């Protein structure tokens, strides 16, 4: 397991200090969302030049940190065709950048059927899934040309809300450059949290070969609502999850989420301890 942290969850004043602080905290990798992590200048498609990519790559090498995921979390199901085209171009810019910076993948969530990118029951329809796939295919085709992996992240409130739908997307697009980020908490809600073991097993049974990265946090139930917290402070079955990771994904990038500079070490130590204690499943 290669444990890391999101760049925008680390205290820093510059890209140089960002990667230095990630290394000082004992992390091996990061998820880099440029628009959130870069503080020196505004990030847009034109800013993502080879020069910037090589500079970040140099910082990574100097600090022994991988860019596990280059984040681009936009709406590929936007009903506004003009905005969708702009979004697809932004994904292509991130794909080019990922190929130069040495990122493991470009990560994305799976959108909503409205321009606001908000939850509606319509997100869970077959028509919504078809719309997302249509928006995703040109992006994956470009990723194939550039030798980059696109990784989709299922989220209950979004279009790909579970691993049955994730499997449908993977099969429909049918590309070796399309894989999956697995965040168990993202697909847990008030109606299914008691079946979390089943959800973890289903993810690996349906999509295990395509899981290329893990997002790690925890959850609590407060007044009937599932809320995310840092790893170790909630109800997620980490012994089961880490058994799957240890058995089937031993060196996978595992990125902590929802941490702050003053509690990242706590979450890191908890996850490492759970991994060390995890039993192999076969």
Question: Which residue stretches match the model-derived regions?
Answer:
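Active-site acidic/histidine proton-transfer and metal-coordination neighborhood
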Residues: 17, 54-55, 59-63, 78-180
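N-terminal pre-domain/capping segments
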Residues: 1-103, 175, 179, 272-282
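H/E-rich (His + Asp/Glu) clusters that bind or coordinate divalent metals
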Residues: 234, 239-241, 246-248, 252-255
